Amino acid sequence: GKDLAEISGMVCSRVTPGYLWVQGDDSYKVRAMTAEGKFSTTIKLHDSYRDWEGLSGGVYNDTNYLFVGVFGDNGLSYKDKYYIYYFEEPEVVDGEVKVEKKIIHFGYPDGKAHNAEVIMYDNIENKIYIVDKWNTFNSTGMVYSMPFSTDMDLETMHVLTEECQLGGNDM
């Protein structure tokens, strides 16, 4: 669709098999789509627009969640103002659905600005993983993590843990 000119995240629906959830970095919507590209459900997550990068899904305490990474930072100007939106995955229906969005606020252990691209959720360890873009000085990216629980909120800034470095041969 025109409102998703650049898809930045895609994950299979766990609630409605045969559908993908997709998200663009140029809108505030998550959409359900068939493999043939037919759009169905629209979830609007109203906020002041930021560079959305990455979408993941997973199960926590027998509930399916979707996670949206609000951490793209091409200008490296946000420093400690990075967020993850998460909400219970709805059933795919025609039209718009409303969800109760929760927000996790996080920063990086070095206290600097980063430009991340990927979010992943580990159902076994209940961890969120974030991968930042490579550093142009040494051509590496970094994988970070933080434990996930539904008690996390916007008021507390959670600091990521550095996991490992990625180079060109690792990807």
Regions found by a protein language model. Give the residues of each.
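Sequence/structural signature of beta-propeller domains
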Residues: 1-171
